[in-house]
Each structure stands twice: as C-alpha cells, then as structure tokens.
C-alpha cells in the first residue's frame, strides 16, 4: 500500500510540473504575439465556427 501511495504521489508531482511548464510556455507565446492582426485572426477562428453552429441549429429548428 505504501508503494502505491508513493507511486501516485510521484505521478501527481510530475503531472503538476508538466502542467506548470505548459502554462509558462503558453504565456510566453502569448506575450510574443503582440501584433493585432494575429489576435484578430485568432478571434475569428474562435467566433465563426460558433456562429455557424448556431445558425445551423436554428435552421434545423425552424425547418421542423
């Protein structure tokens, strides 16, 4: 039982470190991206699929 606890603790610790490193890398990438054109492109990529899904869903509801 003690070995299992040590293994789980080690996995938790390594996962936490990995998550922290990924977050730092993502923050550094966001800081490097200071150009407004890139930000606008990212917003468009997020926004248009959502609008498309909503319109498709509404057309399906109205068609029935």
UniProtKB/Swiss-Prot annotation:
The keyword Secreted belongs to this UniProt entry's keyword annotation: yes
Tissue: Expressed by the skin glands.
Superkingdom of source: Eukaryota
Pfam families: FSAP_sig_propep
Residues recorded with modification Leucine amide: 62
This protein's UniProt keywords: Amidation, Amphibian defense peptide, Antibiotic, Antimicrobial, Cleavage on pair of basic residues, Fungicide, Immunity, Innate immunity, Secreted, Signal
Keyword rRNA-binding: no
InterPro entries named in the record: Frog_antimicrobial_propeptide
Protein's cellular compartments: Secreted
Residues that span the membrane, as ranges: none
GO cellular component terms, semicolon-separated: extracellular region
GO BP terms, alphabetized: defense response to bacterium; defense response to fungus; innate immune response; killing of cells of another organism
Pro-piece positions: 23-47
Signal peptide: 1-22
Summary of the function given for this chain in its UniProt record: Antimicrobial peptide with activity against Gram-positive and Gram-negative bacteria and against fungi. Has been tested against S.aureus (MIC=1.25 ug/mL), B.pumilus (MIC=5.0 ug/mL), B.cereus (MIC=15.0 ug/mL), E.coli (MIC=1.25 ug/mL), B.dysenteriae (MIC=5.0 ug/mL), A.cacoaceticus (MIC=15.0 ug/mL), P.aeruginosa (MIC=5.0 ug/mL) and C.albicans (MIC=1.25 ug/mL). Also shows a weak hemolytic activity.
Family affiliation: Belongs to the frog skin active peptide (FSAP) family. Temporin subfamily.
The protein's name in its UniProt record: Temporin-ALe
């Amino acid at each position: 039982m003690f070995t299992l606890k040590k293994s789980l603790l080690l996995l938790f610790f390594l996962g936490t470190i990995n998550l922290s490193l990924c977050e730092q890398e993502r923050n550094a990438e966001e800081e490097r991206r200071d150009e407004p054109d890139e930000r606008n492109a990212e917003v468009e990529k997020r926004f248009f699929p959502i609008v498309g899904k909503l319109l498709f869903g509404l057309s399906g509801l109205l068609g029935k």
